[in-house]
Design a protein with these regions (language model features):
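Short acidic, Gly/Ser-rich segments with clustered Asp/Glu that frequently serve as metal-coordination loops
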Residues: 7-15
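Metal-dependent phosphoesterase core characteristic of DEDDh/y 3'-5' exonuclease domains
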Residues: 2, 15, 26-68, 88-170
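Short consensus segments that form the blades of beta-propeller domains
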Residues: 20-26
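Metal-dependent phosphoesterase signature
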Residues: 63-86
Length: 172
């Protein structure tokens, strides 16, 4: 089983190498969406949650990226502990965790599990990073040291389907 997920956050960490236990370093989770697929690609489960902010606000610069304001999150959001328990349940069914720049999303969720003092196996799961796996496939010049650059999710989609997509639609 493959657990494919993405997060939206309050921003970026100060230090991408910091441990998830460094709570002040890692931004807060605003939204998480995931799909669980069988080994044959069958869609098994779909979840999408906006998190109700407790003890933080969503900066305007982050809102401009994902479209979720503090007001909206307070009105539509659910408790973080519920989200973490649901996500843990899906993790327990999976063999691989998949995402685009997955190390960022794993650290975001790891920090939230740490803050909530909820145990998880997320940090120990096998991962597939579509950003890294698709770099040679997309073959976009401009990477470091003469290598190809990492493709954005939009660039990967364009290469796979020969058409772009509107990222703003996924944050509704």
């Amino acid at each position: 089983m493959y657990l494919i997920y993405d997060t939206e956050t309050t921003g970026l960490p100060k230090n991408f190498s910091a441990p998830v236990s460094d709570s002040d370093n890692w931004p807060r989770l605003v939204q998480i969406a995931w799909q669980l697929h069988s080994d044959m690609g069958e869609l098994i489960e779909v979840k999408n949650f906006i998190v109700r902010p407790e003890g933080f606000t969503i900066p305007y610069n982050a809102e401009k990226i994902h479209g979720i304001s503090t007001k909206r999150a307070l009105e539509k959001g659910v408790d973080l502990s519920f989200v973490l328990k649901e996500f843990n349940n899906s993790i327990s069914k999976s063999n691989f965790i998949v995402g685009h720049n997955i190390s960022f999303d794993i650290n975001i969720m790891g920090a939230e599990f740490f803050r909530a003092q909820i145990e998880t196996t997320l940090m120990d799961e096998k991962t597939i990073d579509t950003k890294e796996e698709a770099t040679d496939f997309c073959a976009i010049p401009g990477g470091r040291g003469g290598k190809f650059k990492w493709p954005t999710l939009t660039e990967l989609h364009s290469k796979l389907f020969n058409q772009g997509f509107n990222l703003s639609l996924i944050h509704i």
